[in-house]
Amino acid sequence: MSRSKKTRKGGENSPKQQPRVKKQDRAEVTGKRAEKGNKSGSRHNEALIQAQAPQKKAAQKKDPRHGSKKPVALALPTTTEKSATPKVKQPKLTDEQKLLKLEEDPRLNQLLDMLEEGRNLSDADQKWLDQQLNKIEALMIKLGISDELEDEAPAKSKADSDDDLFDRFESGAELLKDYQDKF
């Protein structure tokens, strides 16, 4: 079988081509296109544009550049010392006032209440609580204030021997019997 190459001609069933128009006729149809936009360099040649259109001269005289016209300082601004009013110094608190302020701290009271209830504190809270208690203890030592409970406890522990403890136990039992007899 012989081979036949494909052609671009469609044959009888193909769409019909438009009749060919001569070059002279095409030039008349298109004509010169209308210009759109400004001419090149129009932004920089403002003087030429104003010379060509004198009626616009009075109406518009503005800078063709876009953006802010505000001047910008290129050097660092010099620092001027302000004669600010000095801060009013508050009188220093006495040790007693510091102690009262520490003891009335709501966060301290809240954390102490949490400890009494048996809750665990976070590490940050525990650390803060220890610092506050140390401050309070230092102020109390400085002022000569001491906890009465702490003073009694060491005195008892020194004098306590086995015999003393047994005597106290028996006297407690006797007091209990006396109390029960009354009621």
Curated annotation (Swiss-Prot):
One Pfam assignment: YihI
Intrachain disulfide bonds: none
Positions with biased composition (Basic and acidic residues): 22-46, 92-101
GO molecular function: GTPase activator activity
Biological function: A GTPase-activating protein (GAP) that modifies Der/EngA GTPase function. May play a role in ribosome biogenesis.
Protein family: Belongs to the YihI family.
NCBIfam families (alphabetical): PRK05244.1-1
Protein name: Der GTPase-activating protein YihI
Source organism of this protein record: Shewanella oneidensis (strain ATCC 700550 / JCM 31522 / CIP 106686 / LMG 19005 / NCIMB 14063 / MR-1)
Encoding gene (name): yihI
